[in-house]
Amino acid sequence: WWRAGDNFSIWVLLTIWLAMLAASVVFLIFKHAYRYALDADETPMEAPKRAPQTVLRAAEQLAESDKKALQESILEFTQEKVLRYVEKNVDIYSTNTFTLRSADLYNIKKLPNYRFDAIVNFMPLNQIRGVNKLFTTVNDKLPDNGIWICCYEPQSVTKRNILKRYPPVINWIYYILFFCYKRVLPKLFMTSRLYFDITEGKNRVLSKAEVLGRLCYCGFEIIDERKKGDLNYVVARRKFRPQIVERRLYGIFVKLNRVGKNGKVFKVYKFRTMHPYSEFLQAYIYDRYSLQEGGKFNHDIRVTTLGRWMRKCWVDELPMLLNLI
């Protein structure tokens, strides 16, 4: 029987045992976190192809008393300029227009298919969990070329309010932590479900590019987008229904195809410099912003603030060094 002082130190054995215990705990935590993140309830939203559809009933105008009541109810939670903007884009006083202010998806699901050719929700998307589910549900309820109006508080407004609320230096520290919590965690595979289970999707931070990109991904065409107060309002037209709408998660890296010698296609990695869902905005950006020299857009809303700096300094290209290994 050996003694601790002969060949082994009791402290070495204790250290090894603790290291193995810590590794086992980390492994079990990672294993269960991975299973939790898979979220078995999050299944892709599939839809069969549908025949061309028109609104079910001919439109009629509301009675004057109903028009006044609708105006008063809308002005209780929004400004008159918002009401005028909505009036400009849809006939809000038509029996074929449905208006609501709700974060509950049930209020959309219960609507008869193709009963309304315009749906307006005054509840900011920042307060709604399952934005893609909302968009696809609206898509299913609208007839062909139906109009969908929604609103959200853009990330730029959230940033401005935080920087104004706190003193210098502290405001930037708070904003960086806030950004990591509200923008980074919801987009990562391992933390996305945990984030939404804790916050229930309330007070989300959404960029303009992400909201417009989600709409295009879910089969809408952007007709107009205006800032009214602290909220951005988007008017979109239903164009098609994607066969499958899946949850999309984004990491810090993006994998791209490149063509090399003799036409050989290979993969390269870069740091992500664009907002989520930006890949669905190519046509929208092309239609609204002209190209500058070099084939880039004059005002590309898809690129993040950090991404502009990374592109300017070529930092986003650093992961391509892996191709040399």
Model-found features: residue ranges?
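Conserved small/aromatic sequence motifs within transmembrane helices
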Residues: 240-325
